[in-house]
Amino acid sequence: MKEQKVVETKNLRRFIKKLEIDTYGIADMHLLKEMETGFPIDLNNFLNMFPYAIVLGAQYGKLGKKASGGKTALFLEEAAFSIMEYLEDKGYRQLIIHTEDEFDPINRLGFMSLKLLAKKAGLGWQGRSLLIISPEYGPLHRLIAILTDLPLQNNQLIKNQCDDCRKCIEACPQNALTFVGFNDHPSRREDVLDIKTCLGDNGCLVCILSCPWLKKS
Protein backbone atom coordinates (compact mmCIF):
# COMPACT_ATOMS: atom_id res chain seq x y z
CA MET A 1 0.00 0.00 0.00
CA LYS A 2 2.83 2.41 0.87
CA GLU A 3 4.50 1.92 -2.50
CA GLN A 4 1.16 2.40 -4.24
CA LYS A 5 0.63 5.66 -2.34
CA VAL A 6 4.03 6.94 -3.46
CA VAL A 7 3.40 6.08 -7.11
CA GLU A 8 -0.18 7.39 -7.19
CA THR A 9 0.81 10.62 -5.45
CA LYS A 10 3.63 11.28 -7.93
CA ASN A 11 1.32 10.63 -10.87
CA LEU A 12 -1.39 12.88 -9.44
CA ARG A 13 1.05 15.72 -8.75
CA ARG A 14 2.36 15.43 -12.30
CA PHE A 15 -1.21 15.73 -13.59
CA ILE A 16 -2.12 18.68 -11.32
CA LYS A 17 1.03 20.55 -12.34
CA LYS A 18 -0.30 20.71 -15.91
CA LEU A 19 -3.42 22.49 -14.62
CA GLU A 20 -1.31 25.45 -13.37
CA ILE A 21 -2.86 25.42 -9.91
CA ASP A 22 -1.29 27.96 -7.53
CA THR A 23 -1.24 25.64 -4.54
CA TYR A 24 -2.56 22.18 -3.70
CA GLY A 25 -2.22 19.46 -1.12
CA ILE A 26 -3.50 16.09 0.05
CA ALA A 27 -5.20 15.42 3.38
CA ASP A 28 -5.75 12.13 5.15
CA MET A 29 -9.41 12.32 6.16
CA HIS A 30 -8.68 10.30 9.30
CA LEU A 31 -6.77 13.32 10.63
CA LEU A 32 -10.04 15.26 10.74
CA LYS A 33 -11.91 12.78 12.88
CA GLU A 34 -10.70 14.02 16.27
CA MET A 35 -10.48 17.66 15.26
CA GLU A 36 -13.94 19.15 14.92
CA THR A 37 -16.49 18.40 17.62
CA GLY A 38 -19.15 20.53 15.95
CA PHE A 39 -18.64 19.13 12.47
CA PRO A 40 -21.90 19.34 10.46
CA ILE A 41 -21.69 15.75 9.16
CA ASP A 42 -20.78 12.37 10.57
CA LEU A 43 -17.25 11.77 9.28
CA ASN A 44 -17.41 8.07 10.11
CA ASN A 45 -19.70 7.54 7.13
CA PHE A 46 -17.11 9.09 4.83
CA LEU A 47 -13.86 7.55 6.00
CA ASN A 48 -14.33 4.24 4.21
CA MET A 49 -15.66 5.75 0.99
CA PHE A 50 -13.50 8.88 0.86
CA PRO A 51 -10.35 8.50 2.99
CA TYR A 52 -8.40 11.23 1.16
CA ALA A 53 -8.98 14.84 0.10
CA ILE A 54 -7.23 16.71 -2.70
CA VAL A 55 -7.42 20.42 -1.92
CA LEU A 56 -6.77 23.12 -4.54
CA GLY A 57 -6.14 26.81 -3.94
CA ALA A 58 -5.92 29.82 -6.26
CA GLN A 59 -4.89 33.34 -5.34
CA TYR A 60 -7.38 36.08 -6.15
CA GLY A 61 -6.22 38.63 -8.71
CA LYS A 62 -3.28 36.69 -10.17
CA LEU A 63 -4.98 34.27 -12.54
CA GLY A 64 -5.09 36.41 -15.65
CA LYS A 65 -5.96 34.40 -18.73
CA LYS A 66 -5.86 31.12 -16.81
CA ALA A 67 -9.35 31.77 -15.48
CA SER A 68 -12.38 31.40 -17.74
CA GLY A 69 -14.10 34.77 -17.67
CA GLY A 70 -11.45 35.98 -15.22
CA LYS A 71 -13.21 34.22 -12.35
CA THR A 72 -11.13 32.40 -9.76
CA ALA A 73 -14.04 30.17 -8.76
CA LEU A 74 -14.66 28.97 -12.30
CA PHE A 75 -10.96 28.33 -12.88
CA LEU A 76 -10.79 26.17 -9.76
CA GLU A 77 -13.98 24.34 -10.65
CA GLU A 78 -12.67 23.48 -14.10
CA ALA A 79 -9.45 22.18 -12.56
CA ALA A 80 -11.40 20.14 -10.01
CA PHE A 81 -13.53 18.51 -12.71
CA SER A 82 -10.38 17.63 -14.66
CA ILE A 83 -9.04 15.87 -11.56
CA MET A 84 -12.37 14.10 -11.08
CA GLU A 85 -12.17 12.78 -14.65
CA TYR A 86 -8.62 11.63 -13.93
CA LEU A 87 -9.83 9.73 -10.85
CA GLU A 88 -12.83 8.28 -12.67
CA ASP A 89 -10.63 6.97 -15.48
CA LYS A 90 -8.54 5.16 -12.87
CA GLY A 91 -11.66 3.64 -11.30
CA TYR A 92 -11.74 5.64 -8.06
CA ARG A 93 -14.52 7.54 -6.33
CA GLN A 94 -14.68 11.32 -6.39
CA LEU A 95 -16.80 13.95 -4.64
CA ILE A 96 -16.33 17.68 -5.07
CA ILE A 97 -16.58 20.10 -2.12
CA HIS A 98 -17.38 23.74 -2.99
CA THR A 99 -17.29 26.89 -0.88
CA GLU A 100 -20.93 27.34 -1.85
CA ASP A 101 -22.03 23.94 -0.52
CA GLU A 102 -24.00 25.42 2.38
CA PHE A 103 -26.61 23.35 4.16
CA ASP A 104 -27.14 26.05 6.82
CA PRO A 105 -26.93 29.50 5.15
CA ILE A 106 -27.99 31.35 8.30
CA ASN A 107 -25.01 30.09 10.27
CA ARG A 108 -22.86 29.79 7.14
CA LEU A 109 -22.12 26.13 7.68
CA GLY A 110 -21.06 24.08 4.70
CA PHE A 111 -21.44 20.42 3.90
CA MET A 112 -17.81 20.06 4.97
CA SER A 113 -15.23 22.57 6.20
CA LEU A 114 -12.92 23.50 3.32
CA LYS A 115 -10.71 25.41 5.75
CA LEU A 116 -10.21 22.30 7.84
CA LEU A 117 -9.41 20.25 4.74
CA ALA A 118 -6.97 22.89 3.47
CA LYS A 119 -5.17 23.01 6.79
CA LYS A 120 -4.84 19.24 6.97
CA ALA A 121 -3.64 19.22 3.35
CA GLY A 122 -0.76 21.51 4.28
CA LEU A 123 -1.94 24.57 2.34
CA GLY A 124 -1.59 26.82 5.38
CA TRP A 125 -2.70 27.36 8.97
CA GLN A 126 -5.91 28.73 10.44
CA GLY A 127 -5.42 32.34 11.48
CA ARG A 128 -7.01 34.35 14.27
CA SER A 129 -9.80 35.27 11.84
CA LEU A 130 -10.24 31.53 11.08
CA LEU A 131 -9.13 32.15 7.49
CA ILE A 132 -6.53 29.81 6.03
CA ILE A 133 -3.23 31.67 5.75
CA SER A 134 -0.77 30.45 3.16
CA PRO A 135 2.93 31.38 3.42
CA GLU A 136 2.90 32.16 -0.31
CA TYR A 137 -0.42 34.01 -0.65
CA GLY A 138 -1.49 35.03 2.83
CA PRO A 139 -5.28 34.79 3.35
CA LEU A 140 -6.19 35.96 -0.17
CA HIS A 141 -7.14 32.76 -1.98
CA ARG A 142 -10.07 30.53 -2.86
CA LEU A 143 -10.38 26.82 -2.14
CA ILE A 144 -12.02 23.73 -3.58
CA ALA A 145 -11.57 20.03 -2.73
CA ILE A 146 -12.13 16.60 -4.20
CA LEU A 147 -12.66 13.62 -1.89
CA THR A 148 -11.50 10.24 -3.17
CA ASP A 149 -10.49 6.70 -2.25
CA LEU A 150 -7.33 6.79 -4.39
CA PRO A 151 -4.47 5.86 -1.99
CA LEU A 152 -2.32 8.98 -1.55
CA GLN A 153 0.39 10.45 0.68
CA ASN A 154 -0.81 13.36 2.78
CA ASN A 155 1.14 16.63 2.95
CA GLN A 156 2.98 17.81 6.03
CA LEU A 157 1.11 20.31 8.17
CA ILE A 158 2.24 23.93 8.44
CA LYS A 159 2.73 25.29 11.94
CA ASN A 160 0.50 28.18 13.00
CA GLN A 161 2.56 31.36 12.67
CA CYS A 162 0.08 33.94 13.95
CA ASP A 163 1.42 33.68 17.52
CA ASP A 164 0.05 36.68 19.48
CA CYS A 165 -0.82 38.77 16.41
CA ARG A 166 -4.22 40.48 16.70
CA LYS A 167 -4.20 42.72 13.62
CA CYS A 168 -7.35 41.22 12.09
CA ILE A 169 -9.16 41.24 15.43
CA GLU A 170 -8.37 44.89 16.11
CA ALA A 171 -9.23 45.93 12.54
CA CYS A 172 -12.66 44.24 12.39
CA PRO A 173 -15.29 47.03 12.09
CA GLN A 174 -17.97 44.81 13.65
CA ASN A 175 -15.89 43.48 16.55
CA ALA A 176 -16.88 40.04 15.28
CA LEU A 177 -13.57 38.42 16.28
CA THR A 178 -12.32 37.36 19.71
CA PHE A 179 -8.71 36.42 20.40
CA VAL A 180 -8.28 32.74 21.24
CA GLY A 181 -4.70 31.51 21.40
CA PHE A 182 -5.17 28.18 19.62
CA ASN A 183 -2.26 26.55 17.80
CA ASP A 184 -4.23 24.25 15.53
CA HIS A 185 -7.98 24.77 15.59
CA PRO A 186 -10.43 26.27 18.11
CA SER A 187 -12.77 23.84 19.80
CA ARG A 188 -15.75 25.92 18.62
CA ARG A 189 -16.04 28.48 15.85
CA GLU A 190 -18.32 30.57 18.06
CA ASP A 191 -15.47 31.14 20.52
CA VAL A 192 -13.60 33.10 17.85
CA LEU A 193 -16.14 34.42 15.35
CA ASP A 194 -19.59 35.95 15.78
CA ILE A 195 -20.91 34.84 12.42
CA LYS A 196 -24.08 36.93 12.65
CA THR A 197 -22.19 40.23 12.92
CA CYS A 198 -19.45 39.34 10.42
CA LEU A 199 -19.82 41.24 7.13
CA GLY A 200 -17.86 38.75 5.04
CA ASP A 201 -20.81 37.91 2.80
CA ASN A 202 -21.33 41.62 2.12
CA GLY A 203 -17.88 42.14 0.68
CA CYS A 204 -15.95 43.16 3.80
CA LEU A 205 -12.26 42.28 3.38
CA VAL A 206 -10.84 44.03 6.44
CA CYS A 207 -9.56 40.86 8.13
CA ILE A 208 -7.83 39.88 4.88
CA LEU A 209 -6.35 43.29 4.10
CA SER A 210 -5.09 43.80 7.65
CA CYS A 211 -3.22 40.49 7.74
CA PRO A 212 0.59 40.95 7.81
CA TRP A 213 0.95 37.77 5.77
CA LEU A 214 -0.88 39.40 2.86
CA LYS A 215 1.88 42.01 2.71
CA LYS A 216 4.59 39.37 3.06
CA SER A 217 3.11 37.39 0.19
What spans do the regions from the language model cover?
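Catalytic cores of enzyme domains
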Residues: 65, 69-217
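Non-catalytic, usually N-terminal nucleic-acid engagement modules in DNA/RNA processing proteins
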Residues: 1-72
